[in-house]
Regions:
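Alpha-helical transmembrane segments and their helix-helix packing motifs
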Residues: 2-148
Length: 148
């Protein structure tokens, strides 16, 4: 890339090197399967809890009306805002979400810093952990009155 092109896209090399470093860290973590599964399950738990908050806010506003107008659109915005916080909490808790790992693994495969086997192991462990966290919250909610 020429010096002139680098000025046009200053973050390109920085972003790619950051993603490749993240891939190396994630690959090392996947070697510690139990710990990696815990981080992935935590992301699933956070996602599920904030989805319940999103659903609750949306349904709460859908039941309200002011001047004959339903507040459902405001509820959808409030619910989406609450759900957006899930991604922030996942980031700050250093949990592992499958969607971010797909981006990291794709960049790693493109630049040939990882192989298909390592990539599939990483994605498989992350998916399993995310589903375990989601499943745990689902089982807990089935036995509660929160969704009534």
């Amino acid at each position: 890339m020429s010096a002139e092109s680098s000025k046009l896209f200053p973050g390109r090399h920085t972003f790619i090197s950051f993603v490749l470093d993240a891939l190396e860290t994630k690959s090392e973590m996947s070697g510690m399967a139990v710990r990696y599964l815990q981080r992935a399950a935590m992301a699933g738990i956070i996602l599920a809890l904030f989805y319940v908050a999103h659903y609750g806010l949306s349904s709460l506003f859908a039941e309200m009306a002011v001047g004959g107008q339903s507040l459902a659109p405001i509820g959808r915005i409030a619910g989406a805002t609450a759900f957006g916080f899930a991604l922030v909490f996942i980031y700050f808790s250093r949990s592992e979400l499958l969607t971010s790992n797909m981006m990291v693994v794709s960049v790693g495969l493109y630049y040939r810093t990882t192989g298909i086997g390592r990539a599939l192991k990483l994605l498989g462990l992350c998916a399993l952990g995310n589903l375990a966290g989601l499943g745990l919250v689902a089982v807990l909610l089935m036995g509660s009155s929160v969704l009534d």
